[in-house]
Amino acid sequence: FVCFFKSKEKVYNCLFFKKIGFYLMLLSLPGVIFKMFITLKMVISSGYLSLYVDTPNSGVERVIEFVSYKLYIIGVSFYISSNLSKKDFFKLSLFTLPISIAYLLSGKRGDLGITILFLIWYWFSFIELHKISFKKLLLSSLLIFIPIALLFQAVNDSRENGNSNGANIITNLSSFFAQQGVSGIVLPYYIEYEYSLPKDYPYLISPIVDRLNRGAQSSDLLKNTNYLGAELTAVLDYEAFLRGEGVGTTYITELYSIGNSKVSVFTGMFLLGIAILYFELNRNRPMLKYLSYLVLSTILFLPRGELFELFYEFILLIIIWHVAKIFMQSKVIKY
């Protein structure tokens, strides 16, 4: 057991991967800007919920959004797989943060939160390795967290009410914390309405089985997929579902739905804990650094998201990683 978790340090600085990542990020930039423009345009004209009920009219728009997003993820992943200097890290931040801020303006808060947390984790895991005192860590966390929490709450008020409610700091912080627990109602709702919900196959694997049929919230989505969040929202309030509203989902409910048992929850969380521990102990391995953005995104979204939401992104990145290694070896490009 101890040998299994023994960290296998293999730190290297592959200039080839860093260059690939940087150029792919630049290549994705026009498409990402276009996607942000379309997103902001939809929100301004039709409101935040239009993101969940409307789809681009042109197939070209879908292709641009799909390709640019994949190039962005691949580029960032290759870039962070090498040993970044502080200068390289700031380049990464200057590229990723403005994109996340643009999504924040459209009402999507999660992208900015995940980006900031990932950058902080990466900085202290690979750039600044010296220990920091608890007091400094606590103070820094508060200085970062409080403004972001207030900003997120203002965005939430704006997308729900059209403007900020002008409440004081304490009220806004309290509202922010209260909203973080909203996904806690998903499991009670599931238990109450489980006999009204379809169970063609486990909700846990819906992101894998139904990925190609994922789309706007509509009757077709309910007919062709088995997403827990969509099915549960439709059972609670079908009209609200069609308007783009949703109760969300959580991996705990996905696990519980397998046999409607606490055992499945504990088993799933135990296995997930092992996977996270393995990742943390071996994070210096090049491939795990390469996958770290997706890993952190998955972990941070788990309380309010699906366990396998990024399944195909992981598969794509793993395939591309091995293809890139084969290409390097064929060109005699040394690590």
Residue ranges and their predicted role:
Residues 42, 69, 77, 116, ...:
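Enrichment for repetitive, rod-forming helical segments
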Residues 51-60, 149-272:
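Small-residue-enriched transmembrane helix-hairpin modules in multi-pass membrane proteins
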Residues 80-84, 212, 216, 275-279, ...:
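Hydrophobic, Leu/Ile/Phe/Ala-enriched alpha-helical segments that form helix-helix packing faces
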Residues 244-335:
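Hydrophobic alpha-helical segments
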Residues 91-101, 138-144, 269-273, 289-299:
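Central hydrophobic cores of alpha-helical transmembrane segments
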Residues 3-135, 144-161, 232-238, 242, ...:
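Membrane-embedded catalytic interface detector for glycan/lipid assembly enzymes
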Residues 16, 60, 64, 86-93, ...:
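Structural motif marking the loop-to-transmembrane transition
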Residues 1, 23-30, 140-148, 313, ...:
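Hydrophobic alpha-helical membrane-embedded or membrane-associated segments
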